[in-house]
């Protein structure tokens, strides 16, 4: 199985990589690159909330892994001038776990819950009145003597992040006043991100070197920064330490990341669909078994970018590869492909929302 954040994933050094991720993470909306609509809207909402000395409305951020949901949550707290408490859905197993965090919040603080779609139903029930009325219902005692008491909470902002917005219950989703979807980044914005990260890390990088890394980063800043670190290793060991286009190209070829940003696992998925399932349609469970992966890995990690780039389509009967997949491997396009519709805009293809 592959890591959900993969490097395109190199093993080892994960702790150090995470420390570097924190070091290069933007701290303000002014430094936040890409997502112009989200940035403009959040700047407006934050300015309005600060002007009224109120907590920002509860905010839901969703999109594929690595696009900056956690970064945006931290920026919200920074711009609001408040503290942020971070946790995740799977960690909050009991209502008491959530209550302990909520009762320690200061007025207007931000509570960030990653993977919010994985909250247990019993914890979610406690969260509803906390979000809506800033009150916490707690049961005291047991059996016939049990009674419920209400504790007042300070106003706070819940920022929830998820890759699976479609798995949120309607009552929870409806309680978010602000909903933001993060899209895959274009190459120009990723090039800017790579150049900025290189500057923070003290690396010498040419614009074409940044472009080469950006165009293979699957539209994802997290992957772009990881590729930058691996290209840096290559440049220091087999070059003069400077990252040029040629250096980046050689390093990424060594990492088995092709010009489209596909790694071994992406190519394996596409070839399995072509060779074992005649291009599809194939169900996700059958596909997961064929490549020895978990269903959620295919749905959350592999598929979104392949769909957005137009290599895979979802149909009522299952997944189908498009002409682009055959052309990518230099294979002849089957005559029956003329019967398979190709979306006009793959960027609008819904991905588990």
From Swiss-Prot:
DNA binds at residues 295, 314, 319. Keywords: ATP-binding, Cytoplasm, DNA damage, DNA recombination, DNA repair, DNA-binding, Hydrolase, Nucleotide-binding. Its main location: cytoplasm. SUPFAM superfamilies: P-loop containing nucleoside triphosphate hydrolases (SSF52540), Winged helix' DNA-binding domain (SSF46785). It is found in: Cytoplasm. GO terms for molecular function: ATP binding; ATP hydrolysis activity; four-way junction DNA binding; four-way junction helicase activity. Residues 186-256 are annotated as: Small ATPAse domain (RuvB-S). It catalyses: ATP + H2O = ADP + phosphate + H(+). This is Holliday junction branch migration complex subunit RuvB. The lineage of its organism: Bacteria, Pseudomonadati, Pseudomonadota, Gammaproteobacteria, Pseudomonadales.
């Amino acid at each position: 199985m592959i890591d959900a954040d993969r490097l395109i994933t190199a093993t080892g050094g994960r702790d150090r990589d995470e420390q570097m991720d924190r070091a290069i993470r933007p701290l303000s909306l002014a430094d936040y690159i890409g997502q112009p609509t989200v940035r403009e809207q959040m700047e407006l909402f934050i300015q309005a909330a600060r002007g009224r000395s109120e907590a920002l409305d509860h905010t839901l951020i969703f999109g594929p892994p690595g696009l900056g949901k956690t970064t945006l949550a931290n920026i919200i707290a920074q711009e609001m001038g408040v503290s942020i408490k971070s946790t995740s859905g799977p960690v909050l197993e009991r209502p008491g776990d959530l209550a302990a965090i909520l009762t320690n919040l200061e007025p207007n603080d931000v509570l960030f819950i990653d993977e919010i779609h994985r909250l247990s139903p019993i914890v979610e029930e406690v969260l509803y009145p906390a979000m809506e009325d800033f009150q916490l219902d707690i049961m005291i005692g047991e059996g016939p003597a049990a009674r419920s008491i209400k504790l007042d909470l300070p106003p706070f902002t819940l920022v929830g992040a998820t890759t699976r917005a479609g798995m949120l219950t309607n009552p929870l989703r409806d309680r978010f006043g602000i909903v933001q979807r993060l899209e895959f980044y274009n190459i120009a914005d990723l090039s800017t991100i790579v150049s900025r990260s290189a500057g923070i890390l003290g690396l010498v990088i040419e614009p074409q070197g940044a472009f080469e890394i950006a165009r293979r980063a699957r539209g994802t800043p997290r992957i772009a920064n990881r590729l930058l670190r691996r290209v840096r290793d290559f440049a220091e060991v087999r070059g003069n330490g400077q990252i040029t286009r040629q250096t980046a190209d050689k390093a990424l070829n060594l990492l088995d990341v092709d010009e489209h940003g596909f790694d071994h696992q992406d190519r394996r998925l596409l070839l399995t669909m072509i060779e074992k399932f005649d291009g599809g349609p194939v169900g996700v469970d059958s596909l997961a078994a064929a490549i020895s992966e978990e269903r959620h890995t295919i749905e959350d990690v592999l598929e979104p970018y392949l769909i957005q780039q137009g290599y895979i389509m979802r149909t009522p009967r299952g997944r189908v590869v498009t002409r682009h997949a055959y052309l990518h491997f230099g294979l002849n396009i089957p005559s029956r492909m003329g019967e398979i519709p190709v979306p006009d805009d793959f960027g609008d293809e819904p991905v588990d929302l």
